[in-house]
Amino acid sequence: MSFRRINSRYFENRKGSSMEEKKAKVPPNVNLSLWRKNTVESDVHRFNSLPSKISGALTREQIYSYQVMFRIQEITIKLRTNDFVPPSRKNRSPSPPPVYDAQGKRTNTREQRYRKKLEDERIKLVEIALKTIPYFVPPDDYKRPTKFQDKYYIPVDQYPDVNFVGLLLGPRGRTLRKLQEDSNCKIAIRGRGSVKEGKNASDLPPGAMNFEDPLHCLIIADSEDKIQKGIKVCQNIVIKAVTSPEGQNDLKRGQLRELAELNGTLREDNRPCPICGLKDHKRYDCPNRKIPNIQGIVCKICGQTGHFSRDCNSSSQRMSRFDRNATVNNSAPIQSNDVHYNSNTHPIQAPKRSRYDNNSTEPPLKFPASSRYAPSPSPPASHISRQAQNVTPTPPPGLTSSSFSSGVPGIAPPPLQSPPESEQPKFSLPPPPGMTTVQSSIAPPPGLSGPPGFSNNMGNDINKPTPPGLQGPPGL
């Protein structure tokens, strides 16, 4: 009996031990470090003076501020104790390619990347705490950086047809410079697609040829507020480019206009509207413009409606203006612009005859004697020319008829003949005092004979002295 009892107890113990071993068996895919007690956990709670359990009632803003302070303290303890190694995971993401400095040391190890991540997180939390928590004091080992940077990724994969780089840069980079002035931060376009193909790397700033990240805007500033403002201005341009219909993007049209100004190809008339005097529209777009009645306009050349006489394309424009009886397409004769008057009521303003109508059989025009157009009466017989009567003018007092002549010295005048008796006038003038006969000419020069039929002296005395104060012609 005792033996059976011992055996039964032995087998029961064996069975229980096998069950315990079976329960204690660890699967091969389980990370044992996750189930072990963290040795640094006690140190974290020992250095962190903030309690993790809150018994009182807090508002939402107070809870958020308490979380920020607790996380800042937690990160500070990890950095002090060098507990910045992430938990080992079997299925983790692949590590980036190694990067080395000038001394050949690797700068992107696993620990360095995790430490940099914790430091960036603490910097952001400290900036938030300084603004929201009064009398907040940063940790002792905290050093505020001189510049902050962040990335805004552009949705190129969702909208491949939109030229985001061109909209952000603008004509010759003016849009990007304007964004930097508005946000007071430096904005650079980096990532895949930010550099044109064939661009030399020496002409670009450092980091511009890093094509590992997708297309993004790298924003650098000296405060977190400026970083957020820079992200917002970049986001506004991307949203406007995505939501605006084609051809209605005001930003793109403004950039094209500015580019035309820079190239000198902008053609814009800044003159005001001649109708209302405003500059925001053209004359044909003026709201005060009155459209004329085209059907009420009649051409004076062809007689048709719809156009002015100066715009008429009729062949009658090439016809002679003197052909007043010509007609075009059986229309009314072309009317002259001259004003016609009734000769009966206005005899003075009757049309004049043309100089080309000398051979016309029409009777000459007759005007009344009181009209200013009436011909002047013929002069009386007393107004007959002196040349027709062959009478020399009376010399002035003190001059003789022999010395008063219109001839040229040294040249004999042509012979003068008296007109026939039938043509002589019935009246004659008496000779001047001291003269018995009328002298017709002066004596010829010495050595020359007179004209045929006349004597050499011509009835004059060559030796007769000249009047006092006068000298004779040369050679006399």
UniProtKB/Swiss-Prot annotation:
GO cellular component assignments: commitment complex; cytosol; nucleus
Effect after changing E258V: In MSL5-5; cold-sensitive; growth defect
Compositional bias per record (Polar residues), positions renumbered to this chain: 329-347
Modified residues (Phosphotyrosine): Y100
Residues spanning the membrane: none
Known outcome of mutating R60G: In MSL5-2; temperature-sensitive; growth defect
Subcellular location: Nucleus
Domain (KH) ranges: 153-219
Record-linked SMART domains: KH, ZnF_C2HC
Coiled coil: none
Pfam families in UniProt: KH-I_KHDC4-BBP, SF1-HH, zf-CCHC
Zinc finger map (CCHC-type): 271-288, 297-314
Cystine residue pairs: none
Biased composition (Low complexity): 399-410
GO MF annotations, alphabetized: mRNA binding; pre-mRNA branch point binding; zinc ion binding
Alphabetical list of Gene3D superfamilies matching this protein: 6.10.140.1790, K Homology domain, type 1, Zinc finger, CCHC-type
Disordered as annotated region, ranges: 83-110, 329-476
PANTHER family (alphabetical): RNA-BINDING PROTEIN RELATED (PTHR11208), SPLICING FACTOR 1 (PTHR11208:SF45)
Protein name per its UniProtKB record: Branchpoint-bridging protein
